[in-house]
Amino acid sequence: MAETLTAQAAPVATAPAVTASEKFIFDTQGYLVLENFLKPDHIAKLLAATATTVARRREQTRTGAKQTGFTQVNGKDSTRIFYILDDDPLFLELLDWPAIMPYVHTLLSHMPHHCASDVIVAHASDFPKQVPGWHIDGHDDGFRNLGAPIPLLQLKIGYYLTDMTKPGASHLMVVPGSHKTKQSPGEPGPDGMLPGAVQVCAPAGSAILFHNALWHGIGPFHPGRSRTMLYYAYEHPWMIASQEHWGYTKDFYNSRLSPARQKFFHGFLFDPPQARWG
């Protein structure tokens, strides 16, 4: 079984500069845990927005109605929704949340582009035979064609909206340091685990930042447990690796994005196109 993780957490209240120790942890381990990153009232609002969005998207999926992105309906209660920025203003707000931007700028780029967004609501009753699904992120087979170790091209951020301090709730699992390896981890053991894997245990409101080449998956799902979380991803401005950029309407780009948020997307998406770098 994978061991559990409770260390490497850095409580965050406002938007301080990223510390040398945080950068060191991210560089060596491939991920960084920021406990209690979102405040309780913010979490409550995001959970309410998630519930409303899930109900609407599941109905759109049932009726075949047009929707932004796509929705995976998994059983009676579990849902995963892709392309969520236009589903609720709170989801769009997290795109450039002031407290997270110093981390995105320091760890990835001073001109980050949006790459992906999704919400996960999962209940153990809908996943009786869940497997970890170990993988690395990125197109073209995880950017493996660029050689090993794979460079940092995308920064992924997971926000726990439910308490994940105890293992067994389909936690994010990671293999620390695996983003630097030149070797494949091989096949999982009989229990489905990779060597050195840990479940990332943290309170509701915690943010987990990780490298695109970090091997990760999902942990065991014990009966009666559930998980709600958001994922956001950022990439370099010279990349066109996100199909989500083509998933939103012209009205979204031209009417609902502030000038600052427009800079998270390529200029050619706007009408008229914006002639700019980044």
Each language-model region and where it sits:
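Short Ser/Thr-interspersed hydrophobic loop/turn segments at strand-loop and sheet-helix junctions
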Residues: 164, 211-214
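A structural signal for short, well-ordered beta-strand segments
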Residues: 117-119, 157-159, 230-234
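Catalytic core of non-heme Fe(II) oxygenases with the double-stranded beta-helix
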Residues: 102-103, 128-201, 240-247
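Non-heme Fe(II)/2-oxoglutarate
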Residues: 2-11, 64-67, 207, 214-215, ...
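Non-heme Fe(II)-dependent double-stranded beta-helix
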Residues: 2-28, 35-143
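Active-site rim elements
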Residues: 88-93, 195-197, 217-219
